[in-house]
Amino acid sequence: MKRLFTAAALVALFAAAAFAGVQDFGKFTVDVPEGWTATADGETVGIVKNDNTASASITVSETEGSSLKEIADAFVQALGGKNLAADNGAYTFEFTNQNGVDSKAVLSGDDKNYALIIMTGVENAPDDFGKIINSLTEK
């Protein structure tokens, strides 16, 4: 299996966490932490901490001929993002969601597929976010 994300981009930010187990979402698998709930909706999977203090959404889709940079630019524009940066083959940016909460995004992929992870409440569960990102595996 191929990793969707290069761990080097985010390893320094996160440590280990306890996990409930690997869940299969069609195009990818991910370890969902204990105390979190995952729900699929089309190409997007939402993973929410049960106390609602943190969440992640993971979207895996086809690039349809666009470069990762073009896709990153489109998401930054659509979400009102800022601080777009390239990091080890991935792109990161920040934005404020519709509820006024600051969110962070990581976009990575290859010529065929991309994965976008949007994280909200990172400060409330940094270890869990690190494991979610590092466990994401394309099928």
Locate the predicted segments by residue:
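Sec-dependent N-terminal signal peptides
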Residues: 1-15
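Short N-terminal leader segment in a subset of presequences, especially plant chloroplast
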Residues: 11-12, 28-33, 58
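N-terminal "mature-domain start" segment
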Residues: 21-41, 87, 136
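Alpha-helix C-terminal capping segments
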Residues: 23-25, 74-80, 137
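Extracytoplasmic/secreted proteins, especially bacterial periplasmic and envelope-associated proteins
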Residues: 27, 31, 70, 74, ...
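Surface-exposed amphipathic alpha-helical segments
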Residues: 36, 117-139
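Conserved polar/disulfide-associated segments of primarily extracytoplasmic proteins
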Residues: 40-126
